Structures are given as structure tokens and as C-alpha cells.
Amino acid sequence: MQVKFYKTADERLKPYLEGYYFLKKESLVDVEYLTFPNNFISVSVYHKVGVNFQDNNAVISQNDNLDFTSILVASYKSPIKVNYNGKINEVTFCFKPLGLNSFLPNLSVYFNSSKSFLPFDDYRETMTAILNESSDEVKIIMLENYWLSKLNDFNHFLLDNLVSEMLKVDEQVTITELALKYDTSRQNIHKLFSRYVGKNPADFRKIHRFREALSKRIDLLKEDKNLTVLGYEALFYDQSHMVKAFKSLTGFTPKQFFEGIELKNGAGNWFFTK
């Protein structure tokens, strides 16, 4: 199975779209892995592939009767076991926490929908053409031009500030303190996060700290520092707090997790089981 990740090239898209990856699986041998919570909103498109979600399991299978499939994943709190069966052709877009709102005015209607993600009239046709394109360079031009054509002027001053505050790992501001600072209520903050981010602020912060820990782990490995230092640098209160958070988000202790995960540029998304 071949996976290529690309950072967004166009400066106009960079504030909203972190990047995208192209996945090709030609072998009939099944691949299974665990993927872990993150704060991106992911949109995946497939050609001749069926996707079935049940609890914390996703089965992605070759299906020659399905010309096009598209899904949106906004939030999950525990690992998802993913099985790839047969030949797979996939493109996945990784939008920043508020990013997709700048393309869709009513994003929240898709968060809990079981229907295929088809946000625009020309979406299926364009994404199918992208999936069928053999050149990565041409694919990148096509997909970035498409998302640029859908870009709108979404702007929410309060929410932008709240998300920025939550991303500050060197400060531990409570939701109550944020409500006081921005003259709003805890309830309104929860409502805004649920509507525009797809998860509550507590989960958002916990996942962000976890992801920061993955990123910092690379630097600590270079410096030969231990996991206790990692916990402090990622703003976990103590070692037991870090262990609890890791078990909640990954199903593993930090030691087990870091022994099995492939860390590359702090991504740490996949834990292959077979």
C-alpha cells in the first residue's frame, strides 16, 4: 500500500487546508491499522470502493459496483480500527479545525449524517476525475483549484479567538476563564465548538495535547529524554494524567504506543496491526 502526503501548496488555501494524502493499494492482501483522534476534519473520496462504519471499526473494501464514495469524519474519541480489503484508490483532505467552514456555510448538518458527503453539485464529477488522474502533480493542481473555487468569507471573531486560545499548549486557561475573558458563557462556547468544530472544547483540548505530545516525542528522542519530560512539555499535569489521556485516546500506555507507532513529522496517525 502506497500513501503519499502533501502539504497544501497554494497560500490562499493554507489557512484552511493542512494537506491531503493519496492512497493506492494494488495488492489483494488485506491491511489493518489503528488510527487515532485528531482535530482535523477529514474528507475522503474513493473510486470503486465501499466504506462501512460500525462502532470503532471501518471496513474499506473494493467494490466495482460503486463508482464514487465520499465520507466526512469530524470527531472520534478513541482509536478506529481500519481494514483495507482489495484494491483501493483514495484521496483524503485534512482540513484545519475551522477550515471546512470556509467552504461550506452549514457544515454542522454533515457532522452526524450517515449519508454520503456530497456538498456541491459538481463535487462527484470533479472528485472522480481527480481520483482517475494518474499524475500526482496534476491531481494537486486539480484539487486545489477546486477548493479555491468554493472558498467563501467565513469569519467568526469569537470562535477564531477561542480556538487560538485552546491551541496554546504553554497556557492552561479554563473554559470558565475563557468565557469571562470574551464576555460569553460556557454554554455558548460548547455550542460554538459543537456547531463549527464538531466536538466539545474539552475533547478538543485533550486531543490537541495528545497530538502535541506526538510532535514533541520526535524532539525528545533526538535529545534522549524520557516520557516524564514529554508529559511536562505537553502540559499533562503528571505522569498518571498522561497515561490516562493516552489510554483514553489510543487504548495504549504511552510506552506501548510509542514503541508501536511510526512517527514522522509529528503525524503519528497509523499503528499497523497486520
Predicted region positions:
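Alpha-helical DNA-contacting segments of helix-turn-helix folds
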Residues: 197-215, 245, 249-262
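Alpha-helical bundle regulatory/interaction domains
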Residues: 1-170, 174-176, 182-186, 199-200, ...
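Basic, Lys/Arg-rich alpha-helical nucleic-acid-recognition elements, primarily the DNA-binding modules
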Residues: 183, 194, 210
